[in-house]
Design a protein with these regions (language model features):
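Active-site-adjacent loop/helix segments that line or gate small-molecule/cofactor pockets in enzymes
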Residues: 1-31, 80
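Active-site and channel-lining beta-strand-loop segments
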Residues: 25-46
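Active-site core of PLP-dependent enzymes with the aminotransferase class I/II
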Residues: 192, 207-219
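Acidic active-site catalytic centers that drive phospho-/nucleotidyl reactions
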Residues: 38, 46, 70, 110-113, ...
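Glycine-rich phosphate-binding segment of PLP-dependent enzymes
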Residues: 42-44, 50-80, 84, 88-106
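PLP-dependent aspartate aminotransferase-fold enzymes
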Residues: 91-201, 210
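Generic structural signal for well-ordered, non-membrane alpha-helical segments
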Residues: 5, 29, 60, 82-86, ...
Length: 219
């Protein structure tokens, strides 16, 4: 269908909360595979892929069929009930990866928020089971975090504390306390900020994506 780009942008500016800068004069209408098309018929190679989430590309027929069938069957039940698709997908993910369990969420920032909670819960239980002498030595469960310079972990309050760029963090301070930044790809730098009994979790990206693509050394 025909899309009026100017009207779309006027409506965006008038009714959508402006939290993200969008490309001016570009209204994307549809895609196929690695290609996107705008309202004027221009064709683009989609190098962003929804910021690294559209792994099957746009308009994948099999994926569209599965989504449509599920939408016609059962849409959402919350976590209060068992459902077969969730159980089957978790089983497949675990059997084909390193993980022992699967956790489903909506975004990377939500995954990182959950990771902080998982780590804190783990160290809380670990501390609770310690001998009294060990509890007196450590004083409290480990809660601190470590992430790396130039890393990006999300824009919610916990994940934002792990994110390097000050321009992202400054307007929302004070953030979650207790995070230290190490130099990416430098184990000695990481060793200086990882503290026994205090550091609960270390966040590291196999390849950083802020300002380019920077893979870590294998070691």
């Amino acid at each position: 269908r025909n899309v009026n780009a100017e009207e779309v942008q006027r409506n965006e500016n008038a009714y959508v909360l402006n939290t993200y800068g969008r490309a001016k004069s570009r209204v994307i209408t549809h895609g196929k595979g690695v290609l996107c098309f705008d309202s004027e018929g221009n064709e683009y190679l989609d190098f962003t892929a929804g910021i690294a989430v559209n792994c099957l590309g746009h308009a994948d027929e099999k994926l569209a069929e599965v989504i449509a069938e599920q939408a016609k069957t059962l849409l959402h039940t919350s976590n209060l009930y068992h459902t077969e698709p969730q159980a089957s997908l978790a089983k497949k993910l675990v059997e084909t990866s390193f993980a022992e369990r699967a956790f489903f969420c909506n975004s990377g920032t939500e995954a990182n928020e959950a990771c902080v909670k998982f780590a804190r819960k783990y160290h809380y239980e670990k501390f609770r089971k310690m001998s009294r002498s060990d509890q007196e030595f450590y004083k409290k469960p480990a809660t601190e975090t470590v992430s790396f310079k130039n890393g990006f972990h999300g824009r919610t309050m916990g994940a934002l504390a792990l994110t390097w760029k000050e321009q992202y963090r400054k307007p929302f301070e004070p953030l979650m306390p207790g995070n230290a930044f190490a130099t990416y790809g430098d184990l000695k730098s990481a060793a200086k900020v990882i503290k026994r009994g205090k550091t609960a979790v270390v966040f590291v990206e196999p390849a950083q994506g802020e300002g380019g693509i920077f893979p870590a050394d294998a070691e």
